[in-house]
């Protein structure tokens, strides 16, 4: 029915494109007029358009003129002009939607149109990329356009200073990675002086490779950690124990669910080894947690796939890009467990100081849009979570790539032999081949096999990331075989026959030209600078030379069939497979793609089912014979759909939990901002005192009908324990009191006490003390609360056994814990400020110093902490803070 509807009325995307057709006409209609403008007249358009906005016009009103200005600037500065399809994509981005644009269609240039338009409002535009290289490259490349038109540009990459960050965020256009934007937001909400904040409000963001950032990485929270206090000895001891355990007998391993646990026998062995009666006992929670993480490190985390060992450190490999993630650590003790497994020095476990998911960070933007070559398969998720729909942008030229049927083999060895034979044949006729593997281990295994056959190849994986751009840019040259992990090199165009611009720049770099001079030498705008003119001549001469070389090579490669893509196994997501295929056939070039699959591949083994294997066994095929059966293709797609559905469920589940923390985070961070910006917090502190008084009075008068029956002695003792001297409380004419007059009487006494304290200390110093103490109390309590909520979340899953919705239970109990934290913040703040001594030296300092920014582990397992009975005063606090009840929520 859907297909019939689309045949008659066109697809949803085609209908959306028709709606913006006339707007694109208006942009192109200005082309001739803007060509005639001088550089100065074109540059003055920026001030003119800003003026129209200040007079009340909307961004939509000035869109045609803004787009036409940027199109002409792009031609003058870069020698590039936006195609009509890029105008379509740009309008979609401006509308806060996702433009699905195929590889090589010019997403980077397309984005300059909505970026320029939205930057005119003066509130900042963020262009988000997946790695530092692309952020730096795009900023230098496209930044020339914005600067030509009088806008400022900044870039946020790992390792720059606070001052550089602030300057970059204050620019009209800011390029950066998703990680840096997210971590800067968290760091801004940990500063102790407002001047140390770097970000502005989240206004408008365009997310490049939006599927990678908002879908693939959505399960993994960003975490800023401080140094923990726990000893690291237990990690080594537990690792030695776990090493002795046997799969099935002692350990239950479920690769499909990515989980590993002790069996009953394994639990008995653990109890015997560590001399305890019951591993599940709450007192053994820490040991149980260490064992779980050691099991995961030993059985689920694989060297050269999930991580590499470099210079005595564990470096995480990004699961989606295959890149090394320097400076990132697994949280929750998993990193330490891997260090123990590999026999490295163990660094202390960290304490979470601040955390947020990408989902909740990017949902803070007033307007959010994205671009990618593959998003349509995930449109339901984009709609459900981000309220963004996906519009497919037509290609500038028809795609002629030949996507061949999968080659399915019984075993992995047969598969590798077959694809090596395929590569050998293509190498001999000069056809370039890009091979996509899913791990470093597989890429190096294949490279070794090819070298044995005398086939030279370039290997691009996390171990060789420094040459990434160079390797990918030349992957379209004659007879070049490139092996790349997953989607490494994404964002760099593969041009058939080689990239003359890249070759010219590389030659200039060899000759000693500075990067900035090379970047300016590639532009076309007018200049009087003699050094730049000379560099431009050198660049143009080199460009002509390399164009001649690559032109003939381009023809040879096209004759050989264009770029051929080989996938060494199917990814969990169809979208990732499509991304790999999309590297070939750019801008109407010929090309082809083929996936080689074995029934031993993880996806097939875990989700393909035994049914497929039994069919193959009956066919009696040899290992190196390809299997062709309609059912196999359907099974592969069904396996991928199963995994995609499961992963969507996990991401949705993560978001349901993080939404609870997100509301709490907004309250705390909002409170911090008020404290940092406020001149005086006196009223705020007195209001806290009023809240304490009102609640205390309500409790100590609750069970009595008459004022004479109120527990005023208990009330006095309670308030004296917080901030008020017992002698200052006296009540006359008790029988005439009401709850309200009692509250007011105590508040007036409190106000006088605070005035006296202020007089004793001096008003100016009191204002600074208020800020220092409120910030320190908020930060201390919030960090403890993050830990407590994490403990609650790990244990809440058990509620499902009792027919209780775990998410609902988490919301209710999390709300109770948050209220307890707010009360605790109020009590501690009032206690410290009412009792501060004049000679006390109190300085503004961070409660805990961040030592690292890391990605959480999306599949963490932790021993459960379940709130059961009412705690005694000396019992551990049920909130999970680790303190005694009387020193925590029972204060």
UniProtKB/Swiss-Prot annotation:
It comes from the Bacteria. It catalyses: ATP + H2O + cellular proteinSide 1 = ADP + phosphate + cellular proteinSide 2. InterPro entries: Helicase_ATP-bd, P-loop_NTPase, SEC_C_motif, SecA, SecA_CS, SecA_DEAD, SecA_motor_DEAD, SecA_preprotein_X-link_dom. Zn(2+) binds at residues 877, 879, 888-889. GO terms for biological process: intracellular protein transmembrane transport; protein import; protein targeting; protein transport by the Sec complex. PANTHER family: CHLOROPLAST PROTEIN-TRANSPORTING ATPASE, SECA INNER MEMBRANE COMPONENT OF SEC PROTEIN SECRETION SYSTEM. This is Protein translocase subunit SecA 1. It comes from Alkaliphilus metalliredigens (strain QYMF). The lineage of its organism: Bacteria, Bacillati, Bacillota, Clostridia, Peptostreptococcales.
């Amino acid at each position: 029915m859907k297909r019939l509807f689309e045949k008659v009325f066109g697809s949803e995307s085609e209908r959306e494109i028709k709606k913006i057709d006339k707007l694109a006409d208006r942009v192109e209609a200005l082309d001739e007029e803007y060509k005639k403008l001088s550089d100065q007249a074109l540059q003055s358009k920026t001030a003119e358009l800003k003026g129209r906005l200040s007079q009340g016009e909307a961004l939509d009103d000035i869109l045609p003129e803004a787009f036409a200005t940027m199109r002409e600037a792009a031609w003058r500065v870069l020698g590039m002009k936006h195609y009509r399809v890029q105008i379509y994509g740009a309008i979609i981005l401006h509308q806060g939607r996702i433009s699905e644009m195929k590889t090589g269609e010019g997403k980077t240039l397309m984005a300059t149109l909505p970026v320029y338009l939205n930057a005119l409002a003066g509130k900042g535009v963020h262009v988000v990329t997946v790695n530092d290289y692309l952020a730096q490259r795009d900023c230098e490349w496209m930044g020339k356009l914005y600067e030509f038109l009088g806008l400022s540009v900044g870039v946020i990459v790992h390792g720059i200073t606070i001052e550089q960050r602030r300057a970059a965020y204050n620019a009209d256009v800011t390029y950066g990675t998703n990680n840096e934007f997210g971590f800067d937001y968290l760091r801004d909400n940990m500063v102790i002086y407002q001047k140390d904040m770097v970000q502005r409000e989240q206004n408008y963001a365009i997310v490049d490779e939006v599927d990678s950032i908002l879908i693939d990485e959505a399960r993994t929270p960003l975490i800023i950690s401080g140094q923990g206090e726990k000893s690291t000895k237990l990690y080594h001891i537990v690792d030695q124990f776990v090493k002795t355990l046997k799969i099935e007998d002692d350990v239950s391993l479920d690769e499909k669910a990515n989980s590993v646990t002790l069996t009953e026998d394994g639990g008995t062995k653990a109890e015997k080894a560590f001399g305890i009666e019951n591993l599940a006992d709450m007192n053994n929670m820490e040991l149980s947690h260490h064992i779980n993480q050691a099991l995961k490190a030993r059985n689920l985390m694989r060297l050269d796939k999930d991580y590499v060992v470099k210079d005595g450190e564990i470096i995480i490999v990004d699961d989606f890009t295959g890149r090394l993630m320097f400076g990132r650590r697994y949280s929750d003790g998993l990193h330490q467990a891997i260090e123990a497994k590999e026999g490295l020095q163990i660094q202390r476990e960290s304490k979470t100081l601040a955390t947020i998911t990408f989902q909740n960070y990017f949902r803070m933007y007033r307007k959010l849009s994205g671009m990618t070559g593959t998003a349509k398969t995930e449109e339901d998720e984009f709609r459900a979570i981000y309220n963004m729909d996906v519009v497919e942008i037509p290609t500038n030229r028809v795609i002629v790539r030949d996507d061949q049927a999968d080659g399915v083999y019984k075993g992995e060895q047969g598969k590798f032999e077959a694809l090596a034979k395929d590569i050998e044949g293509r190498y001999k006729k000069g056809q370039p081949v890009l091979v996509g593997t899913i791990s470093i281990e597989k890429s190096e295994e294949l490279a070794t096999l090819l070298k044995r056959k005398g086939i030279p190849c370039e290997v691009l994986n996390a171990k060789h990331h420094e040459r990434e751009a160079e390797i990918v840019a030349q992957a379209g040259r004659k007879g070049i075989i490139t092996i790349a992990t997953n989607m490494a090199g994404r964002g760099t165009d593969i041009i058939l026959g080689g990239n003359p611009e890249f070759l010219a720049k590389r030659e200039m770099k060899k000759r000693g030209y500075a990067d900035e001079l090379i970047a300016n030498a590639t532009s076309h705008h007018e200049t009087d600078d003699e050094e730049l003119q000379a560099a431009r001549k050198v660049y143009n001469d080199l460009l002509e030379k390399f164009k001649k070389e690559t032109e003939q090579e381009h023809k040879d490669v096209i004759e050989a069939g264009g770029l051929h893509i080989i996938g060494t196994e199917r990814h969990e997501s169809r979208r990732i497979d499509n991304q790999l295929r999309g590297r070939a056939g750019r801008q109407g070039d010929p090309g082809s793609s083929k996936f080689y699959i074995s029934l031993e591949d993880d996806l097939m083994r875990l989700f393909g089912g035994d049914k497929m294997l039994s069919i193959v066994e009956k066919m009696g095929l040899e290992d190196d014979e390809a299997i062709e059966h309609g059912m196999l293709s359907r099974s592969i797609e069904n396996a991928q759909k199963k995994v995609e559905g499961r992963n969507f469920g996990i991401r949705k589940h993560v978001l349901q939990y993080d939404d609870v923390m997100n509301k709490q985070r907004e309250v705390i961070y909002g409170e911090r901002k008020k404290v940092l910006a406020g001149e005086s917090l006196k009223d705020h502190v007195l209001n806290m005192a009023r809240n304490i008084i009102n609640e205390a009075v309500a409790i100590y008068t609750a069970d009595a009908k008459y004022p004479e029956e109120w527990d005023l002695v208990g009330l006095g003792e309670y308030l004296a324990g917080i901030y008020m001297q017992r002698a200052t409380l006296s009540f006359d004419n008790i029988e005439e009191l009401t709850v309200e007059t009692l509250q007011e009487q105590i508040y007036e006494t409190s106000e006088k006490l605070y005035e006296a304290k202020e007089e004793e200390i001096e008003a100016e110093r009191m204002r600074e003390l208020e800020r220092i103490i409120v910030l320190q109390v908020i930060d201390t309590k919030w960090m403890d609360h993050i830990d407590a909520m994490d403990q609650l979340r790990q244990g809440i899953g058990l509620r499902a056994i009792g027919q209780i919705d775990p998410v609902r239970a988490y919301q209710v109990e999390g709300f109770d814990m948050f209220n307890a934290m707010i009360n605790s913040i109020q009590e501690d703040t009032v206690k410290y400020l009412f009792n501060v001594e004049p000679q006390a030296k109190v300085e503004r300092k961070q409660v805990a110093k961040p030592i690292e920014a890391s990605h959480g582990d999306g599949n963490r397992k932790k021993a459960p902490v379940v709130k059961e009975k009412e705690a005694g005063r000396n019992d551990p606090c049920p909130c999970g803070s680790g303190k005694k009840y009387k020193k925590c929520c029972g204060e």
